[in-house]
Regions:
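Short, small-residue-biased leader/transition segments that mark boundaries at the very start
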Residues: 1-3
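PLP-dependent enzyme catalytic core of the Aspartate aminotransferase-like
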Residues: 97, 163, 179-230
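Short beta->alpha connector loops at strand-helix junctions that form conserved
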Residues: 6-9
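Active-site C-terminal subdomain of aminotransferase-like
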Residues: 12-146, 150-180, 185
């Protein structure tokens, strides 16, 4: 992988308090070998003393230098000092929080997989997942805290389930210290009919749950009581 961009709003912050992103440049791509495709890096930048980034900084630093020196100047994508401070606080506890997120995600996924009112569970940490082998290879320390599942009763069951949750927050956010739950059919994708939802990969019965830092027992108890109301 040559370049990776990530949202710092999610697990890095971990508390839904910061908006931001990060770019990680691996410094391995030979820009000059594909100069015709990347004129912004391989021709002089008249706005910055005529520098040709790929020649001056090589493949190790061309992209990230242009991003910080020219693009950030033009787009104004500077993070405020307060946001930077809060993000740094989140990073200091990231390794501890991720252990809990992953453990809670696995516990919730296993509970849902065994429940008769749940039609299916999407979580690569489960042995039943078609992506389990990949998760074992690339995510040996845990498969994150986000679980999606479909309720056997369809759209109506999903609606009842969402309304009956007591502990989980109903919101579109993920990767938060608090558990967040979403039914796309009634929120982010509500303009679509059932056929369109299925084609988009978010069928009407689908619920996405981002498991927070609460105790797994409390999360499962909340899920169980909501399922009982269906």
């Amino acid at each position: 992988m040559c370049i990776r961009d990530s949202s710092t709003t999610k697990y890095m912050d971990g508390h839904g308090a910061v908006l931001g992103g990060a770019i990680v440049d691996g410094g391995k791509f030979d820009w000059m070998a594909h100069a015709e495709k990347f004129p912004g890096l391989c021709t002089p930048d008249d706005s910055y003393h005529g520098i040709t980034y790929a020649e001056r900084f090589g493949k190790e630093g061309a992209f990230i230098t242009k991003a910080t020196a020219q693009l950030m100047r033009d787009f104004g994508s500077m993070q405020s000092p307060m946001n930077a401070y809060m993000l740094n606080l989140g990073l200091e506890s990231l390794h501890v929080r991720m252990q809990r997120h992953c453990a809670n995600g696995m516990a919730v996924a296993k509970f849902l997989e065994s429940h008769p009112k749940v039609a299916y569970v999407n979580y690569c940490g489960l042995e039943s997942s078609p992506y389990h082998a990949l998760a074992e290879k690339y995510l040996p320390n845990g498969s994150c805290g986000v679980v999606s599942f479909g309720l056997a009763g369809g759209r109506e069951a999903a609606s009842i389930f969402m309304k009956e949750l007591k502990l989980a927050a109903i919101e579109t956010h993920v990767a938060d210290a608090r558990t967040c739950c979403l039914n796309p059919a009634s929120s982010t994708h509500r303009q679509m009919n059932d056929e369109q939802l299925k084609a988009a990969g978010v069928p009407a019965e689908l619920v996405r749950m981002s498991c927070g830092l609460e105790s797994a027992e409390d999360l499962i108890a909340d899920i169980a009581q909501a399922l009982d109301k269906i």
